[in-house]
C-alpha cells in the first residue's frame, strides 16, 4: 500500500493555474499534490553569443527552491555564492526538455527563459517544473504570435514529465517524498504528446530493477503523462 493510499497507476491531484504572476509573458502555478512550483517565461530579443548569426532562437531554464520549500530550511544558494550540482543538473534537464518542444529556427533572434521556483517540495519538483514550464512557454509564444512578433508557431508538440519508481516491490507512478525517499528504483520520464521520449533518468537505489519492471514503469509513465497533456491543453485553451 502506498503511504498516500493511491493505486500504483494513480497520480496525485494535478492542477495548473495560468497567468499566476503579473509581469511575465507566460506564468503558471503547477501543483503535483503538495509539490508546488511557479514557472514563468520571459521573452527577450537576442540570443546567446554562440548562436549569433545562426538565424534561430533559444530556450533555456533556471531552477531554484525557496529555503523552506522543504521540511527543514536550506540556505539560499545565492548566500553560498554558487549553485549546487543538483540545481545545475535539474535546470539543464528542464532546458533540454523544453527546447525539444520547439523549432528554434521559427523564432529567430528570440530567447525565452523559463524560471522554475519551487515554493513547496514533496517529490517530483523537476517533473512538475517541466510540465508547468511548457505551459508558461506556450502561453508566451501564443502572445508573440498574437502580436505578430512571430510569423509561425514554433511549437512542435507538447512536452510533460512524471516520476515513476519501484516502491516496496511494486512499480508506481508520481512518487511523493515519502515514497521517493524509500523507493528501490527512482526514474524520471520526459515525453512528447506523440509518444516520443525526450529523456529517461533511472537509478536503482536498493537493488537492480528487471526489464519487466522497466517496461512496467515506462507504461505507467506514459499513462500518467497522457493525463498531464490533457491538463496542459485545458489550461492553454482557457
UniProtKB/Swiss-Prot annotation:
Residues that hold phosphate according to the record: 86, 124-126
Catalytic activity entry: tRNA(n+1) + phosphate = tRNA(n) + a ribonucleoside 5'-diphosphate
Protein name: Ribonuclease PH
Role this protein plays: Phosphorolytic 3'-5' exoribonuclease that plays an important role in tRNA 3'-end maturation. Removes nucleotide residues following the 3'-CCA terminus of tRNAs; can also add nucleotides to the ends of RNA molecules by using nucleoside diphosphates as substrates, but this may not be physiologically important. Probably plays a role in initiation of 16S rRNA degradation (leading to ribosome degradation) during starvation.
GO MF entry, a single one: 3'-5'-RNA exonuclease activity
Alphabetized InterPro entries for the sequence: ExoRNase_PH_dom1, ExoRNase_PH_dom2, ExoRNase_PH_dom2_sf, PNPase/RNase_PH_dom_sf, Ribosomal_Su5_D2-typ_SF, RNase_PH, RNase_PH_bac-type, RNase_PH_CS
Record-listed E.C. numbers: 2.7.7.56
CDD domains: RNase_PH_bact (cd11362)
Pfam families xref list: RNase_PH (PF01138), RNase_PH_C (PF03725)
Gene Ontology BP terms: rRNA catabolic process; rRNA processing; tRNA processing
Quaternary structure note: Homohexameric ring arranged as a trimer of dimers.
Keywords, in A-Z order: Nucleotidyltransferase, RNA-binding, rRNA processing, Transferase, tRNA processing, tRNA-binding
Family: Belongs to the RNase PH family.
Recorded name of the encoding gene: rph
NCBIfam families: RNasePH
Amino acid at each position: 500500500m502506498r503511504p498516500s493510499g493511491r493505486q500504483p497507476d494513480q497520480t496525485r491531484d494535478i492542477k495548473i493555474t495560468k497567468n499566476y504572476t503579473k509581469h511575465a509573458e507566460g506564468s503558471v502555478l503547477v501543483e503535483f499534490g503538495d509539490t508546488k512550483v511557479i514557472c514563468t517565461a520571459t521573452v527577450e530579443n537576442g540570443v546567446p553569443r554562440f548562436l549569433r548569426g545562426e538565424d534561430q532562437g533559444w530556450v533555456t531554464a533556471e531552477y531554484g527552491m525557496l529555503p523552506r520549500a522543504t521540511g527543514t530550511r536550506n540556505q539560499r544558494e545565492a548566500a553560498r555564492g554558487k549553485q549546487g550540482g543538483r540545481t545545475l543538473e535539474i535546470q539543464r534537464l528542464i532546458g533540454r526538455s523544453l527546447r525539444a518542444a520547439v523549432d528554434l529556427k521559427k523564432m529567430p533572434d528570440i530567447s525565452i527563459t523559463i524560471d522554475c521556483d519551487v515554493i513547496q517540495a514533496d517529490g517530483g519538483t523537476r517533473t512538475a517544473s517541466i510540465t508547468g514550464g511548457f505551459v508558461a512557454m506556450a502561453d508566451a509564444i501564443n502572445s508573440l504570435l498574437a502580436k505578430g512578433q512571430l510569423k509561425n508557431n514554433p511549437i512542435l508538440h507538447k512536452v510533460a514529465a512524471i516520476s515513476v519508481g519501484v516502491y516496496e516491490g511494486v512499480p508506481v507512478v508520481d512518487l511523493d517524498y515519502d515514497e521517493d525517499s524509500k523507493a528501490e528504483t527512482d526514474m524520471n520520464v520526459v515525453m512528447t504528446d506523440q509518444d516520443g521520449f525526450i529523456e529517461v533518468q533511472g537509478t536503482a537505489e536498493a537493488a537492480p530493477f528487471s526489464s519487466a519492471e522497466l517496461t512496467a514503469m515506462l507504461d505507467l509513465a506514459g499513462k500518467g503523462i497522457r493525463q498531464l497533456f490533457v491538463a496542459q491543453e485545458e489550461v492553454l485553451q482557457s
